[in-house]
């Protein structure tokens, strides 16, 4: 693994034509150490912190099996319309003061349209004017014109998870397709936005699905890859799935670093499964994280995250 890490540092890139079976069987410590070396050499010691606000909750038409916000599932989440832009601005300012680097509004639903989209643009313009934080957005399937409007409002990155591999996608969602996701990502890129896209592990997929997802993201040129671990929510079709081990989480992080050596490998939901906040995650190739709460689940405390990461040698 050390030799492969050196080759990747020197420019080699893993592709679909490579036999990647060894990534699943090699010693865990060796693959994690190699991934950490790649991260340190190609990405440096800086860490990227982002946080999100649930800008519109619930009542989603899509049937993603993992999601508590779908109208297809009976869950006990708060449902509300788009937040007042002033509420969003206040929350953004608070997170910027806490040292967070990126801030994103995330909305439930297939797409954000009409007056809700107008409110989102207004909120981004207000944040762009009054804050210095990097602005990200996650609003489902938008038109090319909408992506341009977001960019003009100050948004620099668009979030659109592919969730899993192409071959496994139909097992997770049937109201939209994997190809719909890819089209969305390319529209955002064509509008001049960077893209944040990853997925969820622990939904019953195989290791080959995870590798396939990592390669697809590399082929798309995605620069920020959030990796979520399924946190089963009562009322969703996946509520009774047994969670994957911490060892599997670490191997997944390392594999994604080997395949996407210069990207932000962003640990998202699931870090609370680690008692120490996920120290080993950041020694296995990760150099970014969502801090604070997730959309419908509890996350990690930002101040504690900063202390932990600085102790590990990262610069905030």
From Swiss-Prot:
Gene Ontology molecular-function annotations: 2 iron, 2 sulfur cluster binding; 4 iron, 4 sulfur cluster binding; biotin synthase activity; iron ion binding
Residues that, per the record, bind [2Fe-2S] cluster: 104, 136, 196, 266
Annotated residues for binding of [4Fe-4S] cluster: 60, 64, 67
Keyword tags: 2Fe-2S, 4Fe-4S, Biotin biosynthesis, Iron, Iron-sulfur, Metal-binding, S-adenosyl-L-methionine, Transferase
Pfam families per the UniProt record, alphabetical: BATS (PF06968), Radical_SAM (PF04055)
Domain of life: Bacteria
Enzyme class per UniProt: transferase
Record carries keyword Iron: yes
UniProt subunit comment: Homodimer.
Family the UniProt entry places it in: Belongs to the radical SAM superfamily. Biotin synthase family.
Function: Catalyzes the conversion of dethiobiotin (DTB) to biotin by the insertion of a sulfur atom into dethiobiotin via a radical-based mechanism.
Protein's name according to its UniProt entry: Biotin synthase
Upper lineage: Bacteria, Bacillati, Bacillota, Clostridia, Eubacteriales
Gene from which this protein is expressed: bioB
